[in-house]
């Protein structure tokens, strides 16, 4: 059965991090070969499975939403990176190009300044190279916010969302996002979105209120040194979302891939 619209939603690729999505092999201009680690090969395998499933969906129109942060960037003196921000952008283009070529539109949301450069210029550079859709307000290839009307379904896409780190406060960030959105939409006399897409914190979540569904997307990055500090012991799944739209209704399918806990040592 062919549906009207299929959208793949991904975010926080963090390409350039030593613990994030990376090609199996990448040749630098000077001839040095960078190769994916064992962990990165696991991420890449799931990435390939995600896209194989998405490209197999029969739809009249297809799109990709990258909800911020193609690249890790050079930040906070971290040693867990592979090179310059510009190199990361080149790798991101190579990783994304085969999938962008198979869809009708690419929408790019700007991420945080730490990863995406001030003003989101890293996301903008990759978006421009990939021919992403222009923002109707500013003419740029990326934007901090996208409101997308797709087959009668309104999506509201922003990279940032507040955190909800402790298990007993899980979901508070989504509840806040939905209620703030509904309130401000009412104040502005705007139509509330059917789907809120948020990212940044890498922890998948979903909450619904009054027909407004909010989702936080997972990332394509495992825990780095900073994550081990602020959330010790956490094992967040990686992955993305499929949004399938037919007859004015949306079905959101999360695709989550969970890393395994490390083997225990024997005394």
Language-model region placement:
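Short catalytic/ligand-binding loop motif for oxyanion handling, primarily in non-cytosolic enzymes
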Residues: 16-18, 72-76, 115-119, 165-166, ...
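Active-site metal-binding loops of divalent metal-dependent hydrolases
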Residues: 11-14, 68-71, 111-114, 160-162, ...
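Conserved beta-sheet core of the metallophosphoesterase superfamily
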Residues: 151-156, 161-255
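An acidic, phosphate/nucleotide-engaging active-site surface
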Residues: 117-158, 162-170
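N-terminal active-site segment of His-dependent metallophosphoesterases
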Residues: 1-87
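A structural motif corresponding to the C-terminal end of an alpha-helix
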Residues: 53-62, 94-107, 189-192, 246-248
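Active-site neighborhood of divalent metal-dependent phosphoester bond hydrolases
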Residues: 35, 43-44, 71-139
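Residue-level marker for buried hydrophobic side chains located in beta-strands
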Residues: 7-9, 64-66, 108, 156, ...
């Amino acid at each position: 059965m062919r549906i009207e619209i299929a959208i793949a939603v991904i975010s926080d690729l963090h390409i350039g991090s030593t613990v994030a999505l990376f090609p199996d092999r990448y040749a630098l201009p000077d001839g040095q070969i960078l190769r994916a680690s064992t962990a990165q090969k696991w991420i890449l395998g799931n990435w390939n499975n995600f896209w194989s499933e998405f490209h197999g969906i029969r739809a009249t129109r297809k799109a990709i939403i990258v909800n911020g942060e193609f690249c890790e960037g050079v930040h906070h003196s971290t040693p867990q990176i592979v090179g310059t921000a510009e190199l990361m952008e080149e790798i991101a283009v190579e990783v994304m190009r085969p999938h962008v070529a198979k869809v009708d539109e690419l929408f790019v949301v700007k991420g945080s300044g730490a990863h995406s450069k001030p003003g989101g210029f890293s996301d903008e550079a990759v978006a421009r190279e990939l021919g992403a859709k222009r923002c109707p307000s500013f003419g740029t290839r990326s934007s901090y916010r996208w409101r997308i009307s797709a087959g009668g379904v309104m999506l509201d896409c922003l990279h940032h969302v507040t955190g909800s780190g402790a298990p007993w406060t899980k979901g508070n960030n989504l509840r806040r996002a939905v209620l703030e959105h509904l309130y401000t939409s009412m104040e502005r006399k705007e139509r509330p979105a059917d789907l809120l897409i948020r990212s940044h914190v890498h922890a998948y979540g979903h909450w619904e209120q009054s027909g407004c569904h909010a989702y936080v997307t997972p990332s394509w990055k495992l825990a780095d040194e900073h994550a081990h500090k602020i959330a010790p012991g956490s094992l967040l799944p990686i992955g993305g979302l499929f949004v399938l739209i037919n007859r004015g209704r949306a079905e959101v399918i999360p695709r989550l891939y969970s890393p395994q806990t490390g083997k225990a040592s024997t005394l």
